[in-house]
């Protein structure tokens, strides 16, 4: 489907099931979407301890919203998706990714430019405990490019409540080290703590980097015993397919060859 903004494809793959692509780039697949969405949401949610509100920029496949809705104290999830066609197609063809998230009464769907939505929310005084940038890559010229610039990252910072955190894709650090480092450094211009995670995402065919950023929440330092107790208390221990208490520290343990990419400056805790 060619929408007003991009070319949208959902096709069948023998290994990955239904695969969702935008402008030729794979965004998610039924078989392994849980990996990226759990890693984008649960490390910072567990470290926070009591998230009640969340904002997703992008996320038209509903996967991030689905993970946020699994948090027991979550009262509100706002999803700001540029393209109504993405949501329409995802609702029909990607139920194994969104699991009906868009029909949950706690979800508010805003169709429009993510930067404009964030600035409007900020200017109205709205603040969120968690923020997920679930977007296409940060290439110049992509529909999401402005969100990764100074104005977009400052708006994201300003939308967070005290103690809040955001997550965002840095991309494949081995294949695109310059892009990953640039995003890392840009985040450091707006947040005191910027911490990279890496995880293998099969459909991307690469080790993938995801950052969590906050002024005060040290996600990386979360105590393993606390995480295990919280997962059990929230009835998520065993329910999640990727994230668990033992994985938390491992996500932040960078391979040695990637450590120089993210060291230095004021961008690491």
Residue ranges and their predicted role:
Residues 1-12, 209-269:
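SAM/dcSAM-binding transferase cores
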Residues 3, 28-165, 174-184:
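The AdoMet/dcAdoMet-binding core of the Class I SAM-like
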Residues 6, 115-116, 195-199:
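Glycine-rich, charged/polar anion/phosphate-binding loops
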Residues 8-11, 17-23:
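Short, aliphatic-rich beta-strand segments
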Residues 15-16, 162:
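Short strand-connecting beta-turns/loops that link adjacent beta-strands
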Residues 153-154, 179-201, 211:
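Conserved Class I S-adenosyl-L-methionine
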Residues 166-167, 195:
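Structural detector of well-ordered beta-strand residues that form the stable sheet scaffold
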């Amino acid at each position: 489907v060619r929408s007003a903004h991009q070319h949208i494809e959902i096709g069948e793959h023998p290994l990955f099931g239904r695969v969702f692509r935008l402008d030729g780039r794979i965004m998610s697949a039924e078989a392994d979407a849980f990996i990226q969405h759990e890693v984008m949401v649960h490390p910072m949610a567990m470290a926070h301890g009591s998230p009640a509100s969340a904002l997703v920029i992008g996320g038209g496949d509903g996967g991030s919203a689905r993970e946020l809705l699994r948090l027991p104290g979550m009262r509100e999830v706002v999803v700001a998706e540029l393209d109504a066609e993405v949501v329409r197609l995802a609702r029909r063809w990607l139920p194994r990714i969104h699991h009906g998230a868009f029909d949950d009464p706690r979800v508010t769907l805003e169709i429009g430019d993510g930067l404009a939505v964030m600035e409007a929310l900020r200017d109205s005084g709205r603040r969120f405990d968690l923020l997920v940038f679930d977007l296409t890559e940060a290439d110049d010229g992509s529909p999401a490019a402005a969100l990764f610039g100074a104005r977009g990252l400052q708006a994201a910072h300003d939308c967070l409540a005290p103690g809040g955190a955001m997550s965002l894709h840095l991309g494949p650090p081995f294949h695109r080290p310059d892009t990953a480092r640039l995003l890392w450094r840009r985040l450091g211009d707006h947040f005191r703590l910027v911490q990279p995670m890496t995880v293998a995402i099969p459909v991307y065919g690469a080790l993938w980097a995801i950052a969590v950023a906050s002024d005060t929440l040290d996600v990386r330092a979360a105590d393993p015993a606390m995480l295990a107790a919280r997962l059990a208390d929230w009835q998520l221990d065993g329910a999640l397919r990727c994230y668990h208490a033992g994985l938390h520290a491992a996500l932040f343990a960078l391979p040695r060859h990637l450590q120089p990419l993210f060291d230095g400056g004021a961008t690491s805790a």
